C-alpha cells in the first residue's frame, strides 16, 4: 500500500475532525451534498425553504454512519442564492457539530456565507469551496477578513491537465491563468487547513490523471488530498448509452445498478489510493459509501502495519469494522 516516509504529512484539525496524515493513521472523512440543485427536499431554492424534517433525517443518517464506522463526516451545503446559503448554514450549524463545506456556483453566494459565518461565530467551522484559478478578489477579501481558516484548494489547470500541470497550478500558477499558485493564494487568505482537490473530471477527460495526482500531492506536498470522484462517471457517454439501451429493453434495475456501481466505484478507487477526504455526491448515497470506505480504511491499516503505521485515533474503522 502507499506510504510516504520522505515527506511529513500534514494533519488538519477542523473543529475536531482530523484530515490527512500517513495512509492508515486517520480515517477518510466523508461529505455528502445536501440542498444541491434539484434536491427534492428543497421547496424554494432562491429563498432556501426546505423540508426540515427530511433534511435532519439525512444529516442524522450521516452522523449515525460516522459513529458506526469511525469515518467522520463534514456537511456539504450548496446554495443557489445568498438568502438560501445563509439559511442553510444557520440551520445545519444547529443540527450538527460537524464542519460545514460552503459551496455554490456563484462567488457572491459563497462570499455572503463567509461574511455571515463571521458575524454569527461560525467562521472556524466553515470549509470554503474553493480556492481555484478563477477565484475572485471579493472571495479572497472575504476570507481574509474572516476567521475562516479552512478551504478546499483546487488543482484544476485549464491549460495543462497532466499531473505536472495540476501540481504547477498549485505551487506556481500558470501563465495566462494565474500569476500565483493556489497554495500561495490560500496562504495569503490565512488558510491553515488547505484540503487539496485533485479536480476530478469526467471519464475520458483526464479523470485518470486526477486519481494519479493524489499520489504526487502526498509525496511532494504532504498535504491532505481528496475531491469529488463521483464526477468521473457523471458525464460518461458510454454509460449513458448503455443505461438507455437497458431501459429500452425493460431492464430498469440493471440500468440503476450500472449507474450506482459506477458512482460508488469511483469513490472506492479514490479511497484505495488513500485520499484523505471524499465529497461523494448526493447525501442519499451515504449508506452505500460509508461501509465500503470503512472497509478500505481498515485494509490500508493492515497493509501498512509492516512499516509501523498505526491508527492515531481510537475511533478508526480498523478498530471498529474488522
From Swiss-Prot:
Pfam families: MtrH. It catalyses: 5-methyl-5,6,7,8-tetrahydromethanopterin + coenzyme M + 2 Na(+)(in) = 5,6,7,8-tetrahydromethanopterin + methyl-coenzyme M + 2 Na(+)(out). GO terms for biological process: methanogenesis, from carbon dioxide; methylation; one-carbon metabolic process. Keywords: Methanogenesis, Methyltransferase, One-carbon metabolism, Transferase, Translocase. InterPro entries: Dihydropteroate_synth-like_sf, MeTrfase_MtrH/MtxH, MtrH. It is an enzyme of class 7 (translocase). The keyword Methyltransferase applies. Pathway: One-carbon metabolism; methanogenesis from CO(2); methyl-coenzyme M from 5,10-methylene-5,6,7,8-tetrahydromethanopterin: step 2/2. Transmembrane segments: none annotated. SUPFAM superfamilies: Dihydropteroate synthetase-like. It comes from the Archaea. Its EC number is 7.2.1.4. GO terms for molecular function: tetrahydromethanopterin S-methyltransferase activity. Part of a complex that catalyzes the formation of methyl-coenzyme M and tetrahydromethanopterin from coenzyme M and methyl-tetrahydromethanopterin. This is an energy-conserving, sodium-ion translocating step. MtrH catalyzes the transfer of the methyl group from methyl-tetrahydromethanopterin to the corrinoid prosthetic group of MtrA. The complex is composed of 8 subunits; MtrA, MtrB, MtrC, MtrD, MtrE, MtrF, MtrG and MtrH. Belongs to the MtrH family. This is Tetrahydromethanopterin S-methyltransferase subunit H.
Amino acid at each position: 500500500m502507499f506510504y510516504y516516509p520522505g515527506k511529513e504529512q500534514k494533519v488538519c484539525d477542523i473543529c475536531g475532525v482530523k484530515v490527512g496524515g500517513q495512509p492508515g493513521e486517520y480515517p477518510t472523512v466523508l461529505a455528502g451534498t445536501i440542498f444541491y440543485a434539484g434536491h427534492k427536499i428543497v421547496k424554494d431554492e432562491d429563498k432556501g425553504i426546505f423540508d426540515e424534517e427530511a433534511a435532519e433525517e439525512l444529516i442524522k443518517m450521516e452522523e449515525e454512519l460516522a459513529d458506526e464506522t469511525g469515518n467522520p463526516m463534514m456537511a456539504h451545503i450548496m446554495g443557489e442564492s445568498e438568502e438560501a446559503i445563509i439559511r442553510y448554514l444557520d440551520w445545519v450549524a444547529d443540527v450538527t457539530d460537524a464542519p460545514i463545506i460552503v459551496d455554490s456556483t456563484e462567488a457572491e453566494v459563497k462570499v455572503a456565507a463567509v461574511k455571515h459565518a463571521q458575524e454569527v461565530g461560525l467562521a472556524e467551522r466553515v470549509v470554503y469551496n474553493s480556492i481555484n484559478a478563477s477565484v475572485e478578489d471579493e472571495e479572497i477579501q472575504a476570507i481574509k477578513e474572516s476567521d475562516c481558516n479552512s478551504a478546499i484548494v483546487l488543482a484544476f489547470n485549464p491549460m495543462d491537465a497532466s499531473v505536472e500541470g495540476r501540481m504547477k497550478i498549485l505551487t506556481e500558477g500558470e501563465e495566462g491563468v494565474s500569476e500565483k499558485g493556489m497554495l500561495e493564494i490560500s496562504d495569503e487568505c490565512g488558510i491553515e487547513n488547505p484540503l487539496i482537490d485533485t479536480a476530478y473530471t469526467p471519464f475520458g477527460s483526464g479523470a485518470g490523471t486526477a486519481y494519479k495526482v493524489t499520489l504526487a500531492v502526498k509525496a511532494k506536498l504532504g498535504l491532505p488530498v481528496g475531491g469529488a470522484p463521483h464526477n468521473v462517471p457523471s458525464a460518461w457517454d458510454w454509460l449513458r448509452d448503455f443505461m438507455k439501451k437497458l431501459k429500452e429493453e425493460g431492464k430498469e434495475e440493471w440500468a440503476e445498478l450500472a449507474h450506482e456501481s459506477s458512482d460508488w466505484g469511483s469513490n472506492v478507487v479514490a479511497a484505495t489510493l488513500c485520499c484523505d477526504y471524499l465529497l461523494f455526491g448526493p447525501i442519499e448515497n451515504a449508506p452505500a459509501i460509508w461501509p465500503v470506505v470503512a472497509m478500505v480504511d481498515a485494509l490500508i491499516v493492515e497493509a501498512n502495519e509492516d512499516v509501523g503505521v498505526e491508527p492515531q485515533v481510537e475511533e478508526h474503522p480498523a478498530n471498529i469494522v474488522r
